[in-house]
Amino acid sequence: MPPPDLELPRFLEAPLFAGHPWVYRDHVPREFRADSGTLVRIRAGSFSAFALWDAESQIALRVYSTRELPSASWVADRVRQAWELRSLVRSQETTAFRWLFGEGDGLPGVVVDLYGRFAVIALYADGLERIAEW
């Protein structure tokens, strides 16, 4: 099923084109309804992207992709790229480091810290656990 469409105020076009990763609740039409964790196609002027909807947070939308609908392989690519980017840290004799930096690694709201053989995963958006369904 295609994601729902959401038309946002045109004044958001410039900040979103500049790479701002969030849309705040105040900027979302009040009548919009979806379950948390739903991928939404957003538009603001000529800007278009796929974003993750959070029905509870003041950060209502986290922009995930301006090119394609995120999928399992899309998420795996972001995780792999973050792993490769941290190769210098991994090659040193450290036993703890941050693997995923959320928005900085293209996975808004997801932070992963490694401590030895253990990973601590923090999800900062309601419904983000649904990412596993992609």
Task: Identify the residue ranges that each predicted region occupies.
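RNA-binding accessory domains that recognize and position tRNA/RNA substrates
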Residues: M1-W134
